[in-house]
């Protein structure tokens, strides 16, 4: 077991590098085999765990940390590798983590020491790119499946990513200690999908630790050791980078060829930028500085850079002297799929929102933002995200970590509009929609995979067809479970598709999607008019067939939310100049006759005529003030899938 003297750290999700800076509080580890770097590649095994949300991946990682002795009982806490509070609360992993473990295997009377690099990956569909680059750093993958729920759509998507990279798959059933577990049924299902025998599927319990040591033995036995040339020019792949307030950007790499040593000058091959290496180290599971990294090893680099975007995930690191000329394959820029406006409820918070987004972007290279102004909501930012969970988590982090009150507008996808004069416009916001004649509109489409009990096939097909989905194929994984594949517009699934799917299948269906290009579509922009004036925050781009339903829904909602005025206010939904829905907010009638106790009828008539004239004048010059609460209620109930209904 590795002991270390250090300041004991409270569970706050704070920087793991903080204490390594304070003199006297520096870690003094009593070394284990894994603390020495430049291990022979034959003694290294790099593997990751692929699992759906809530299938016990982080709990299994906890047991591995305890079994291999890198975390003592005193320091142990649940979900040790999930450092953010939000990761623990939601039970999801957002940032991939890695840890270096030592493990001994006794065979034929001799004991061999091995170094295992465990790379913990996110399970959610929005973070597929995070998963794909974590897989690049491995030779093997543990396919972890809940023995109560069986294999889910996102696990299947990540499994295919692993198979594309020729990773060795070790199938494992978790949670076998639960009374509702059905390991035999799901072992047969997994074996059917990946072409193994059901006897090859290991059975473990992350909670009790049963079967975990056998799993580590299997990792050593089945996963191939890393291949690479120690004498070739240095090439290392970045699979993650995080911003640390004490040390700047910490870049996690896997060395493919050559070696990395401290105080060398390194270069990023995608940008050509060069930096001096201040520190090279390993994570076990707290960071420890080392003498360098050799072939197949996983560790971190610190260069003192302050912006994560200069250390791009998937990029190749090489040395300036005798550097490599060919980068490793597979690098791509993460690009936003969904856009949404974020506005502070109190406009004086705008500078705080700008600073907060800047800090979040240090840790999240996929987040993009640019200033925008809305007549209704004031100044804010148009932000680009990977998907709905990404929006949700970013907004929650802004509200929690930076204490901001925000309104987010309905999410939008990126449309490509070609006008009559062949001008091409990229639209990420309804206010960018061109006026005048439009020749064609292209919208992004996705391939979606749904896995659900076979009894729900009818209701799922009905839902997908109502969202303009085209059936691509259907397979039975077992007599009870079916996989459906559809091509569907991304704009149709970013609202409330996932919630509708869950409610129609009693929560049993799981969903995964991936980009599949674009298609022509008959889309229109629906404006909501109050008193004849368009309110930009309520505009939306919808399909022609569902425009009138959207118009009716919004006009009804606003009729309830906007307070009555002294004059009648029409609430209209319009496509261009054509009104497609209308509701009236009735006027408040002030009783002008209350002071007349009797007397002549002409006196009363005169007062009523005067009131009528005043209302007429008010109607021509009066402006309708929409209260902030009405915006919040209309947008939050409309956007992101009616989350309040959950």
From Swiss-Prot:
Keywords: Cell membrane, GTP-binding, Hydrolase, Membrane, Nucleotide-binding, Protein biosynthesis. The keyword GTP-binding applies. It is an enzyme of class 3 (hydrolase). Residues 42-227 form the tr-type G domain. It is a peripheral membrane protein. The keyword Protein biosynthesis applies. It catalyses: GTP + H2O = GDP + phosphate + H(+). It comes from the Bacteria. Belongs to the TRAFAC class translation factor GTPase superfamily. Classic translation factor GTPase family. LepA subfamily. This is Elongation factor 4. It comes from Mycobacterium leprae (strain TN). The lineage of its organism: Bacteria, Bacillati, Actinomycetota, Actinomycetes, Mycobacteriales.
């Amino acid at each position: 077991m590795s002991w270390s003297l250090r300041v004991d750290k409270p569970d706050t999700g704070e920087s793991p590098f903080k204490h390594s800076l304070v003199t006297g509080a520096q870690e003094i580890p009593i070394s284990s085999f894994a603390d020495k770097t430049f291990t022979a590649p034959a003694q290294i095994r790099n593997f990751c765990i692929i699992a759906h949300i809530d299938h016990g991946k982080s709990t299994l990682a906890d047991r591995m940390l305890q079994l291999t002795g890198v975390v003592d009982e005193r320091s142990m806490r649940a979900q040790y590798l999930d450092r953010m509070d939000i990761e623990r609360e939601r039970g999801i992993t957002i940032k991939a983590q890695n840890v270096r473990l030592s493990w001994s295997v006794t065979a034929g009377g001799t004991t061999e020491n091995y170094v295992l690099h465990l790379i913990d990956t996110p399970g959610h569909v929005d973070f597929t790119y995070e998963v794909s680059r974590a897989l690049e750093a491995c030779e093997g993958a543990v396919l972890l499946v809940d023995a109560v729920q069986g294999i889910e759509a996102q696990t299947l998507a990540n499994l295919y990513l692993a198979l594309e990279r020729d990773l060795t798959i070790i199938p494992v059933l978790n949670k076998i200690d639960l009374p509702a577990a059905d390991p035999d049924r799901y072992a047969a299902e997994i074996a059917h999908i990946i072409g193994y025998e059901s006897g090859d599927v290991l059975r473990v319990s992350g909670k009790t630790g049963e079967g975990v040591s056998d799993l580590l033995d299997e990792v050593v036995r089945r996963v191939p050791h890393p291949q690479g040339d120690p004498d070739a020019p240095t090439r290392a792949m970045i699979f993650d980078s995080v911003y640390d307030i004490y040390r700047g950007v910490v870049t996690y790499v896997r060395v493919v060829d050559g070696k990395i040593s401290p105080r060398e000058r390194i270069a990023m091959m995608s940008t050509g930028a060069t930096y001096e290496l201040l520190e090279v180290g390993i994570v076990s599971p707290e960071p420890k500085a080392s003498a360098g990294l050799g072939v197949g090893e996983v560790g971190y680099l610190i260069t003192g850079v302050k912006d994560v975007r200069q250390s791009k995930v998937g990029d190749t690191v090489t040395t300036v002297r005798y550097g490599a000329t060919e980068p490793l394959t597979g690098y791509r820029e993460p690009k936003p799929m969904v856009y949404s406006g974020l506005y502070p409820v109190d406009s004086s918070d705008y500078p705080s929102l700008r600073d907060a987004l800047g800090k979040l972007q240090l840790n999240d290279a996929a987040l993009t933002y640019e200033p925008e102004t809305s007549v209704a909501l004031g100044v804010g930012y148009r932000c680009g995200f990977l998907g709905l969970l990404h929006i949700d988590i970013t907004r929650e982090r802004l509200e929690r970590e930076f204490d901001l009150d925000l309104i987010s507008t309905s999410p939008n996808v990126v449309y490509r509009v070609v006008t009559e004069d062949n001008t091409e416009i990229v639209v990420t916001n309804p206010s960018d929609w061109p006026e005048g004649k439009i020749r064609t509109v292209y919208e992004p489409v996705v391939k979606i995979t749904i896995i659900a009990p076979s009894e729900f096939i009818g209701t799922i097909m009905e839902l997908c067809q109502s969202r303009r989905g085209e059936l691509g194929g259907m397979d039975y994984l077992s007599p009870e479970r079916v996989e459906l594949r559809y091509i569907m517009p991304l704009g149709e699934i970013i609202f409330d598709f996932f919630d509708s799917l869950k409610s129609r299948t009693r929560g049993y269906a799981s969903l995964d999607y991936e980009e599949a290009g674009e298609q022509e579509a008959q889309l229109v922009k629906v404006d909501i008019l109050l008193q004849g004036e368009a309110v930009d925050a309520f505009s939306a781009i919808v399909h022609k067939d569902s425009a009138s339903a959207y118009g009716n829904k919004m006009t009804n909602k606003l009729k309830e939310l906007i307070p009555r005025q002294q004059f009648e206010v029409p609430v209209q939904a319009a496509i261009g100049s054509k009104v497609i829905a209308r509701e009236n907010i009735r006027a408040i009638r002030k009783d002008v006759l209350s002071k007349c106790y009797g007397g002549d009828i002409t006196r009363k008539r005169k007062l009523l005529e005067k009131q009528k004239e005043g209302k007429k004048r008010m109607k021509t010059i009066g402006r309708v003030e929409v209260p902030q609460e009405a915006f919040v209620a209309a947008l939050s109930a409309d956007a992101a899938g009616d989350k309040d209904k959950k």
